[in-house]
């Protein structure tokens, strides 16, 4: 049976290179896998919305789906919104028999929003626990380089964190305030990886998003920070394989 293709969508500031450890491991397991470059990253002038990012993801999907291969989309952080938008009209129920579909969405400490909300809106503290979490852990300013190591890469080895920081690009702020037009997690089976030691998107905020939709998400937990692909790539690969249909323990 043909395995689904795995498409990884980078989070804000990040490039495909940040996810190559996952891609290479999946290749060794006979998965077709790719991390997609986002046109908005370091764009000049800055792109006003995520529209071109979504189009880049859809092109990657069609590369596999047009030949009948199903696809699993993996979104990290900000790109949770993008994988939902890119899946519009591509679920199994939307497509005729024989065409590949988006069969699962994976949210890695990612933003999952209802229609009409944005990343910035979803990260506004809504409970006393969330207010306290942001006060103690600090919500990252994308322009504050001094916080990047501690907030994004707190569970990574120092050399890995240095390398990751050296690759970071600039993220147009307006892409993060663009409201969602589609909530694919309500119609496509979805997995949410809660990273309990995440200092960028606190655990309680991840849990709130993962509990949306009356059980829409299969919830998986790990004791990683905001960059599990770098701090524990083997765990992430096991999680992806499980979500893709393999009967393995995470």
Swiss-Prot record:
It holds the Pfam family Abhydrolase_6. This is Alpha/beta hydrolase nvfD. Its EC number is 3.1.1.-. SUPFAM superfamilies: alpha/beta-Hydrolases. The active site is at residues 198, 226. Alpha/beta hydrolase; part of the gene cluster that mediates the biosynthesis of novofumigatonin, a heavily oxygenated meroterpenoid containing a unique orthoester moiety. The first step of the pathway is the synthesis of 3,5-dimethylorsellinic acid (DMOA) by the polyketide synthase nvfA via condensation of one acetyl-CoA starter unit with 3 malonyl-CoA units and 2 methylations. DMOA is then converted to farnesyl-DMOA by the farnesyltransferase nvfB. Keywords: Hydrolase. GO terms for biological process: novofumigatonin biosynthetic process. Pathway: Secondary metabolite biosynthesis; terpenoid biosynthesis. Belongs to the AB hydrolase superfamily. PANTHER family: AB HYDROLASE-1 DOMAIN-CONTAINING PROTEIN-RELATED, ESTERASE_LIPASE_THIOESTERASE DOMAIN-CONTAINING PROTEIN. One of its GO terms (molecular function) is racemase and epimerase activity. It is an enzyme of class 3 (hydrolase). Disruption phenotype: Completely abolishes the production of novofumigatonin, but accumulates fumigatonoid A and asnovolin A.
